[in-house]
């Protein structure tokens, strides 16, 4: 088996560059591409990526890429790969698939042929015609794009947004990975006050606190790669120990959130406790329209209701206007919000100083920041 393999850290549309920079900071050079960031690394590096990436959805091992213009070419290409290095005679290996602009447009047929080719390979290697599939799962994916087939193994298992601290999503759930990306893209930096005036169940502020405390987002969960065959388990254990040692919750200061819903605030506190950050973020019941904070500099960051239903739109627009007033009451502060509402800036009362477009789930959104310092004229 080789020391280095090709990997992909998948990401929501618009966040590929954010994930590539995360990998670079881990000492793993990466290149952003549509749908994620591609990199070459060891199994140990992939374990660190699973443990530390805040904004990626999954880490995938690329088994190979090859031309497949016919089902026969797909079968032979899959069969030629060393599946026995990762799959035992008892491993379950479900196959998912995706096709785009390929001559082989039947996803179901591509999945079936891929499964059959892997079985034929394993039959010859394990010298058996019967596979129990009674042990751990190794998830296989076949993707065909423009007649190029790519075969991957899922090294994450459960998606990376599942940190383990959130047990209730609320009415407007924001994935932990997206929340971490918004924190990263906002003007806030550790040491500055940060406040979410509509915190809901606390995800944005908890992700900010985890970053400030250098808490690995995957610290309390497991990953599929840890169950793979022939893995460096001692190295994986050391990587976890290093992450535990790096966690410094005493560094957290100046992060707070508020919501008008007492139940949401109670859940935010519970999630904070489950993240191992009990008492490190101040969550309180309060109306965002009455918010008044101290400090000459700081950052507001929030996920407002989008008003997707026509009946909610006017109420949301009035709320956006109140947020514009909130920023005016806090000169020297910035305010960042993610929204799919086309009239957000008009209701807010000013144009955004910075915008970034991406998808929150299936909704096309813009991440807007107001109150950035004007560049000095030369």
Stretch-by-stretch model annotation:
Residues 2-138, 378:
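Non-catalytic nucleic-acid substrate-recognition regions in nucleic-acid-modifying enzymes
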Residues 53, 158-163, 167, 372-378:
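Flexible, glycine-/basic-rich loop-and-beta segments that form/coincide
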Residues 100-103, 159, 305-309:
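A short, flexible beta-alpha/helix-coil linker loop
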Residues 140-156, 368:
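C-terminal edge-of-domain segments
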Residues 151-187:
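SAM-dependent Rossmann-like transferase core, predominantly class I methyltransferases
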Residues 174-292, 308-309, 315:
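Conserved S-adenosyl-L-methionine
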Residues 286-378:
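C-terminal catalytic and target-recognition region of SAM-dependent MTase-like enzymes
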């Amino acid at each position: 088996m080789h020391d280095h393999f090709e990997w992909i850290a998948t990401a929501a549309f618009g966040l590929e560059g954010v994930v590539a920079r995360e990998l670079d900071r881990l000492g793993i050079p990466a290149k952003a591409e549509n749908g994620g960031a591609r990199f070459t690394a060891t199994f140990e590096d992939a374990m660190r990526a699973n443990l530390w990436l805040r904004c990626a959805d999954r880490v995938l091992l690329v088994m190979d890429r090859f031309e497949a213009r016919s089902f026969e070419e797909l079968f032979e290409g899959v069969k030629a790969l060393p599946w026995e290095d990762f799959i035992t005679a008892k491993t379950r290996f479900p196959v998912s698939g995706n096709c785009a602009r390929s001559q082989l447009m039947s996803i179901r047929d591509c999945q079936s042929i891929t499964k059959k080719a892997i079985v034929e390979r394993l039959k010859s290697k394990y010298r058996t015609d019967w596979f129990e599939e009674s042990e751990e799962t190794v998830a296989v994916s076949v993707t065909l794009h423009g007649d190029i087939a790519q075969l991957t193994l899922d090294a994450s298992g459960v998606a990376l947004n599942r940190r383990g601290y959130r047990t209730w999503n609320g009415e407007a759930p924001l994935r932990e990975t997206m929340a971490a990306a918004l924190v990263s893209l906002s003007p806030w930096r550790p040491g500055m006050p940060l406040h979410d005036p509509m915190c809901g169940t606390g995800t944005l502020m908890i992700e900010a606190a985890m970053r400030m405390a250098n808490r690995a987002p995957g610290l309390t969960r497991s990953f599929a790669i840890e169950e793979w065959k022939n893995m460096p388990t001692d190295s994986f254990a050391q990587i976890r120990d290093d992450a535990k040692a790096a966690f410094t919750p005493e560094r957290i200061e100046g992060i707070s959130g508020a919501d008008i819903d007492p139940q949401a605030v109670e859940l935010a506190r519970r999630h904070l406790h489950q993240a191992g950050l009990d008492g490190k973020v101040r969550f309180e019941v309060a109306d965002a329209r009455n918010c008044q904070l101290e400090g000459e500099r700081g950052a507001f960051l929030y996920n407002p209701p989008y008003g997707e239903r026509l009946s909610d739109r006017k109420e949301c627009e009035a709320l956006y206007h109140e947020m514009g007033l909130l920023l005016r009451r806090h000169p020297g502060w910035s305010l960042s919000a993610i929204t799919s509402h086309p009239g957000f800036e008009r209701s807010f009362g000013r144009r955004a100083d910075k915008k970034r477009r991406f998808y929150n789930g299936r909704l096309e959104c813009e991440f807007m920041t107001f109150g950035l310092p004007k560049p000095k004229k030369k």
